Every structure is written in C-alpha cells, then in structure tokens.
Amino acid sequence: MARPDDEVGPAVAPGHPLGKGYLPVPKGAPDGEARLVPQNGPEALNGGPVLDPLVAGAQDGPQALIAAEEETQARLLPAGDGEDVPCPACPPRTALSPRRFVVLLIFSLYSLVNAFQWIQYSSISNVFEDFYEVSPLHINWLSMVYMVAYVPLIFPATWLLDTRGLRLTALLGSGLNCLGAWVKCGSVQRHLFWVTMLGQILCSVAQVFILGLPSPVASVWFGPKEVSTACATAVLGNQLGTAVGFLLPPVLVPALGTQNNTGLLAHTQNNTDLLAHNINTMFYGTAFISTFLFFLTVIAFKEKPPLPPSQAQAILRDSPPEEYSYKSSIWNLCRNIPFVLLLVSYGIMTGAFYSISTLLNQIILTYYVGEEVNAGRIGLTLVVAGMVGSILCGLWLDYTKTYKQTTLIVYVLSFIGMLIFTFTLNLGYIVALFFTGGILGFFMTGYLPLGFEFAVEITYPESEGMSSGLLNTAAQILGIFFTLAQGKITTDYNSPEAGNIFLCAWMFVGIILTALIKSDLRRHNINTGLTNIDVKAVPVDSRVDPKPKAMVSIQSESSL
C-alpha cells in the first residue's frame, strides 16, 4: 500500500539522487553519519526508513533538495529484492521440520527394543535359573549390568554427544543394541550363561547412548509448545519396551513346570530342547527387529533440522563452538544447587522403579506360586499406566510450564502408590495387584520425563545431554544399591513388604529434596522472549557477571 503524502515529505523528481536510493551527506560530515535509525512508528510498518536528524535536516525545503545534488552521495542497500540487511534486533528465523516425527519414532522404537532386552530375563527369572542352572543373583545381574555399565561410560558418551552430535550417538546406540541381540542368539545352551551375559553387556553399553537422548532429541527437533510432549513420547518408547518385556517372555518362554499336570518338572532332554527352542525364538526375533531398526537409523535419522525449532536452539546454534567447555559444563552443573537436589531426588525415584521392575517376578511369586504369566501382566499394567502418565504429564507441562509443582505432586502420589501396593501384596487376591500396580506405575513411571524436562529448564544453556546423563547416572547407581538391598531384605526376612518399605523410606527423602528445589525456568524465558542470556558456560559463583544481557522479567515458579 502506498504511504500518504504527509508521511513521505516533498516529492522527489525522477532521476534525482534521492530517487535512486542515495542520501545527501552535508559537506564536512564525518563518514558514516548518514544512517538509518530504527523506527517503531508508521514509517517502520510501511517499510520507510527514518533518517538521522542530521540527514533529515538536509531535506528541509526545496532549497535543500536542489543543493543536495552538489553534496557527497551515500549509497543505500535496496529495500526490495536486494540483499537482506542484517538486523541484530530481529529474532533468528525458526521453523518446524516434518522429519521430526520420523526421528522421534525411530528413536522410540530402538529404545523400546533396548528396554525389552533389559527386562526380558527378570520377567521370567525362574525359567532362566532352571535353564542355565544359576542362582537368582546371577539373573538379577543380567538386569543390574545395565546400571553398572552406565556409570563409568556416561561421561565419554555425553562428550561424544556434545562434540560429535546426535546422529553418531544414535547410530552407536542402535548398532550396539543390534550387535548384543545377535550375540545372545549364540547363547542358547545350558553351559553358555557367560555368552548371554556378554550379549547383555553390549546391550547395556548401547543403553548409555540411548537413555540420555530424549531431551536432546526433543530440544533439537521440536518447538517450545511441543518439546515436553516430545520428550515424554521419547521416554515412553523405553517404557513401552519394559512393558513388552513383562508381557512377551512369559508367553514365548513358558515355565515347563506349568505344563505338567502332576506339577512335577521333569528335566528330560525333550523339555530342555523345548525350552531352548522357545528361548531361541525370542532371541532371534529380537535380533531381526534390532537389525531393521539399525538400518532405519542409518537411513533416516538426521543430525538436526535445517532451521532451529525454537529461539533457545537458535541462540545455541549461534554460539561459537570454542566457547563451549565440557569441563566447565560439568562443573557448573555440580555447583548448581537446584540441579543437585533434583539429581538426588530423580535418582531415588528412578532407582526405586528399576528395583521394583527387576524384582517384581520374585515379589509376586512369593505369595502367588505358579503365576508367572500374571506377574508379567502386572508388570505390563504398571508400565502401561506409566506411559499414560508420561504423556499426560508432558502435555500438562507444555500447557502450564509448572515444572516444580507438577514434579512434587507426582512424587508425593508415587510415594502413596508405593504404600498402597506394598500393603495389598498379601491380600490373597492377585486381581487387586493389577489395580494397585497400575496406580504405582502411573505416577512412578510418569515422573521420568518430568525430571528430564525440569533439569533442562533449570540448567539452560548447559547441554541437555549432560544434564540427562547425570540424572541417569544417579538413577543407575541408586538402582544397583536398591536392587541389591531390597533383594537381600526380601530374601532374609522372606517378606517383600520389608523390601518395599525400605524403598518408601527413601522416596520420602526424595519428596523433601524436591520441595527444596528453587525453580528458575531459564529455557522457557528465552523461548518467550523474556530474557536473552549469554550462552557461555560461566561458573555459578564466578566474578564474571553472568546476568542476562537484556531482561524484561524473569519467570520463576512460586515456592510451595
């Protein structure tokens, strides 16, 4: 639309220097004094530049226009189809890539298979004890090796993620998961327990490159209004694998004793061959699926979208690589008190979940002998309910951004759910455990993505992979401790309730720590334009001023 005459000033004759995009510069004026001044008024909306007063004064009246031909001329960049003028005040361009859903799906699927391989032994622990002729502790170590491997390997894995990127990390996770599945296929003989352990070790190394990726995948590929839901969906893939790990193994590899009408298990060669055949079917099926997903990762999993999906990601992309310090990032996180509190509370909750998942079959069979299939179904119920909880919590966070309140409420409800599950174990009605297990799973498993997203918020602009990796490290360490301690308490006292109460005491400590966390929604403030912070890693107590460059207001959650 053409602007009114009263906005453009005197008419300029065709061929006049002003009409060709030149500005008059008064004699004696220093170089660079003819310039454009940013404008927020009608001229700016209509594309008209506003001149510095020095230049504007040269245009007053026809006399100035005629004299302007004798002055030095300054060439302006065209305002039309020419080269864009850089605008430091303008926000970076962002866009959402349709490929983000493909990347999220691929990651969720190979994470699913990895979680399935973690729990497939524990869900039918009595079957593998008979087949390999080993103790329950040996079978428990097939689960705990995931936790042991994670602790020393998380730091090199996080360094690899931060320096080599998302794609290489994804390829290593998917590839090692595939390799471990094939190694297990060669372990289906009674004397080859060490081979199945080797395959499980490879899968546990793959897990190091998987567990810390939900937050980076969500942040790099998804916009601010969907990042929490995307993170919850990525975590959901791992949870779904655990659910399938509880459901399928009891069906694919049933305990032979349950097929004998006399109730006696005859260790004949035929029974051993049948058991080996069933285990073979499960292992080869897992290997073929893992191989397919690995090739899919190679083909379709890309490093990042062409354009950043959010202002927070755009700022991180513009940060020079040499400004990022891996050691400074770790040091900053370790000195960030709110993050340390979250680190311990997340480790308690997730470690308790790992312990319950590992020992669930033994807990159920203590009171309900021969109910391996139903024990697996209870585990399935626990995890599926948690998947629903994860998605709902992710949607809630995207809508409200109430990270601390939501995390604390879910923590308290998980504690209550654990108490209910504990004191309904010996009622004599296994149906009741489906209900109480579902309550426990809804809140306990639903907490996992909350911890990831809360950590990213209070540690931005530190690497999402670093914060997620440290959270998972705490979870693995406490998971090992809880599994060994709960297993010993349960065995020594022949009482699953005693082991569960042990976990309840620790979860109560986690509630207190969560309540003490000071919430500072740093990433959310960037995405909403409330603040523009320096992305350099600066120690939290450094003498260097770490305050935002520009600040309108900072959003924090109220303390409870």
Swiss-Prot record:
Bilayer-spanning residue ranges: 93-117, 136-163, 166-185, 193-221, 227-252, 271-300, 337-367, 372-400, 403-425, 429-458, 467-492, 496-518
Primary location: membrane
Residues in compartment: Cytoplasmic: 1-92, 164-165, 222-226, 301-336, 401-402, 459-466, 519-560
Its membrane topology: Multi-pass membrane protein
Gene Ontology CC terms: mitochondrion; plasma membrane
Region annotation (Disordered) ranges: 1-43
Gene3D superfamilies linked to this entry: MFS general substrate transporter like domains
Residue(s) carrying Phosphoserine: 542
Positions that bind ethanolamine: 207, 476
Keyword Amino-acid biosynthesis in record: no
Cellular location(s): Cell membrane
The protein's name: Choline/ethanolamine transporter FLVCR1
Organism: Mus terricolor (Earth-colored mouse)
Chain's gene name: Flvcr1
